[in-house]
Regions:
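Alpha/beta-hydrolase
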Residues: 1-118, 125
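Generic alpha-helical secondary structure signal
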Residues: 104, 108, 131, 169-176
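Hydrophobic, Leu/Ile/Phe/Ala-enriched alpha-helical segments that form helix-helix packing faces
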Residues: 110, 117, 133-138, 182-186
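Active-site-adjacent alpha-helix of alpha/beta-hydrolase-fold enzymes
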Residues: 112-113, 122-158
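Short His-Asn-centered micro-motif
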Residues: 120-123, 167
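Catalytic active-site module of serine/aspartate enzymes centered on a nucleophile-bearing elbow/loop
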Residues: 143-186
Length: 186
């Protein structure tokens, strides 16, 4: 009854430290500066064995992120500072089970979904993991826009989950196709 129901999300702290003391030592990732730590959390595949990442990075020869491809660093730090501080533990459990293919209740009733469905995502984000669910839907009006700008072997350079929302090119690559689909389904 006294279990852990939420986990700390360090985004606000990362953003604040990277803005106020970018070259200072990171308390969250020893050996990196505050700015490097923020960029690491934005660009690294942090979801286990999947290549899912938040933002497409620019990397040095050692693989450390030095910047972002589609988002000005200042915009990313602003995003971090406005992010949530806690996420429900159950969310991560359910999410991990879906990614791992563990039987769970989330796909039990997908055949009852008969409305039009649009899978909107980033090839370097969670988007590709929704594609396999299409075959479980009752709807036959299913469309997909997975923003992809790189070949599979460059997955860490690929458009990421948060790039969909804050990248400078997201209006044309992500939002316009969504608007067109919505207008076609009025």
């Amino acid at each position: 009854d006294q279990g852990v129901f939420g986990s700390f999300v360090p985004f606000q702290l990362l953003g604040s430290l990277a803005k106020s003391d970018p070259d200072g030592d990171s308390p969250l990732l020893p050996g990196l500066t505050n700015l490097q730590a923020a960029l690491f959390f934005g660009t690294a595949p942090l979801f286990g064995a999947t290549p899912i990442h938040y933002l497409a990075g620019v990397f040095d020869v050692d693989g450390l992120p030095t910047g972002l491809q589609y988002v000005p660093t200042g915009n990313f730090l602003d995003f971090l500072e406005s992010a949530i501080v806690w996420q429900p533990t159950k969310f991560f459990l359910d999410y991990d089970e879906v990614l791992a293919g563990v039987d769970n209740p989330f796909d039990d009733n997908l055949a009852a979904v008969t409305i039009p469905v649009y899978n909107w995502g980033a090839a370097g984000g969670v988007g590709p993991y929704g594609t396999e669910m299409f075959g479980l839907l009752g709807s036959r009006d299913v469309a997909e826009n997975l923003v992809s700008l790189h070949p599979p072997e460059e997955i860490l350079l690929e458009f990421g989950h948060i790039d969909l929302f804050i990248a400078q090119n997201s209006p044309d690559l992500a939002w316009k196709p969504l608007l067109d689909w919505l207008n076609a389904h009025r």
